Design a protein with these regions (language model features):
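Cytosolic-side transmembrane-helix boundaries in multi-pass membrane proteins
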Residues: 10, 16, 311-313
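Hydrophobic alpha-helical transmembrane segments of membrane transport/permease proteins
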Residues: 46, 54-95, 253-261
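Short, contiguous pre-domain boundary segments
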Residues: 12-23, 81-83, 87
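Short beta-turn/strand-loop junction motif enriched in small, turn-promoting residues
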Residues: 11-12, 40, 165-166
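N-terminal signal-anchor/first transmembrane alpha helix
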Residues: 2-9, 17-67, 149, 227
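Conserved beta-strand positions that form and line the central face of beta-propeller blades
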Residues: 34, 77, 91-92, 101, ...
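Alpha-helical transmembrane segments of integral membrane proteins
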Residues: 95-313
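Residues marking the start of alpha-helices
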Residues: 31, 89-91, 165
Length: 313
């Protein structure tokens, strides 16, 4: 009898320890445990991390600085992959129309693309989250006016809005970031407004509203934090979209100046040589751009599947 009681006691203790272990799993650990089940998403995440590290340590990885005009040799322009330049540099992917090492240009181009995408995405995220939550909180005519402006803007393609703003502001990094933010912030406003409107009807928010406190405190403390999951999903999509928009605008000549080795500019410089057999000038930067955008989108799709309750299995 005592043995059975001890066994039951041990069994109960084991069960309580297991339950405690299950409860002690952090949300981040649970998220990663689910994320790594998708091998494609894990590979895509590895590609994104590798590209980020490559962009950060670009000066130590490439044989030539594409910003250094003194190192350019025009007689080495449009050389095929594997060409050894007059300065002794091995151009693994060849050279572009200005004699720059194409591999160096691609790595620095990835650096610029990530910078444009992350900065523009972060600014659009911040503006859209605040404006959307504010509109859902105040309601009334203010909400109607804000959302009608957003609806009108969303009726136009993002590339058209970005092109118009970039053409007005001119070439440059700051001008291009403003154009990308203007073209993308409305998506965050719409998403934040929908999530915040749903949160505002919940009991804990209504209880907070019954206490005399500022509206911004309620938004920042209760509404905005619980509206982040759908905004994070939109952010991953919009970062990839911003990178694509930057490349498109640079290709069209209204993005970064010709001295900036962005991927769009490299593709634009090599586009005219496609039919003359010098395919590498445009093809290799295009492949790098496709890999970057595809990897970010695959990671974003997995994050969406995990954060969206309707898509959870």
């Amino acid at each position: 009898m005592r043995r059975s009681i001890r066994a039951c006691g041990r069994g109960g203790a084991d069960m309580s320890m297991e339950a405690h272990a299950v409860k002690s799993v952090s949300p981040l650990s649970e998220f990663w445990h689910t994320f790594r089940r998708n091998k494609v998403a894990v590979v895509a995440l590895g590609v994104v991390i590798a590209i980020i590290l490559m962009a950060v340590f670009a000066p130590f990885l490439v044989p030539q600085d594409p910003y250094d005009l003194k190192s350019l040799v025009l007689r080495d322009a449009r050389r095929p992959p594997g060409y050894v330049g007059s300065t002794g540099i091995l151009h693994l992917l060849g050279t572009d129309s200005q004699g720059r090492d194409l591999l160096s240009g691609i790595v620095y181009g990835l650096r610029i693309s990530l910078q444009m995408g992350l900065v523009a995405g972060a600014i659009a995220f911040s503006i859209g989250a605040v404006v959307g939550c504010f509109a859902a909180y105040v309601g009334g005519r203010t909400e109607t006016m804000i959302m009608r402006i957003v609806d009108i803007q969303l009726s136009f393609p993002a590339i058209l809005l970005a092109f118009v703003v970039a053409a007005i502001l001119g070439q440059g990094k700051s001008q291009l970031i403003l154009a990308l933010v203007f073209a993308q912030y409305a998506y965050f406003v719409r998403t934040a407004h929908g999530a915040a409107a749903a949160e505002r009807q919940k009991d804990y928010v209504q209880a907070a509203l019954s206490v005399p406190m500022s509206g911004w405190f309620v938004i920042s403390r209760h509404i905005l934090p619980n509206s982040l999951p759908p905004l994070i999903v939109v952010a991953t999509v919009q970062i990839a979209s911003a990178i694509s928009l930057e490349a498109t605008l640079s290709f069209l000549g209204v993005g970064l100046p010709p001295t900036e080795p962005s991927l769009g500019m490299l593709i634009a410089n090599g586009f005219q040589y496609l039919m003359s057999g010098r395919y590498w000038i445009a093809i290799y930067p295009g492949i790098a751009l496709i890999i970057l955008i595809m990897a970010i989108n695959l990671v974003g799709d997995q994050i969406r599947d995990q954060l969206n309750p309707r898509l959870r299995k």
